[in-house]
Design a protein with these regions (language model features):
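Alpha/beta-hydrolase
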Residues: 1-52, 56
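Short linear functional motifs in flexible/disordered or boundary regions
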Residues: 8-12, 70-72, 88, 115
Length: 115
C-alpha cells in the first residue's frame, strides 16, 4: 500500500474508505498471487512496441513514489505518438488523492484540449 496511498483514516476520500465489493479472482488469474512477479496468464504479455501504433490523445500520469516508476511511465511516453506525461512529485499511485487539486486542474486542461 505504500506505493498506492497513505494509510486510510476518517479524512480519506469515501471511495477509498468504503468496503470493496469485488473479488480478486480475475487479478490472480491474470497476474498471479505475487504482486511483483507476474506468473498468471499475462506473464508473457508485452504491449510496449505496439504503443507506437496508438492514434488517440494519451495522458500519462504517475507519481515519483508510484509502482509505475518514472522509467515505466517514460517508456510509455517515448512510444506513444504525441503523448503527454505528467510526473507528480511526492505522490504515489493514487495521485488524485495525494495532489487532488493539481490532478483535477490537469484533467480539465487536457480534456478541454481534446474534447
Amino acid at each position: 500500500m505504500r506505493h498506492c496511498n497513505s494509510p486510510l483514516n476518517e479524512n480519506s476520500p469515501e471511495c477509498l474508505r468504503r468496503e470493496a465489493k469485488i473479488g480478486n479472482e480475475s487479478y490472480i488469474t491474470a497476474w498471479g498471487p505475487n504482486e511483483f512477479t507476474p506468473i498468471g496468464n499475462l506473464k508473457d504479455f508485452n504491449y510496449t512496441e505496439k504503443l507506437r501504433n496508438w492514434k488517440v490523445p494519451s495522458l500519462i500520469i504517475s507519481g515519483t513514489s508510484d509502482l509505475c516508476t518514472p522509467l515505466l511511465a517514460k517508456t510509455m511516453y517515448d512510444r506513444i505518438p504525441g503523448a503527454r506525461w505528467e510526473l507528480f512529485e511526492d505522490s504515489k499511485h493514487l495521485v488524485y488523492v495525494d495532489q487532488n487539486e493539481k490532478y483535477i486542474n490537469l484533467l480539465i486542461e487536457w480534456l478541454n484540449k481534446y474534447d
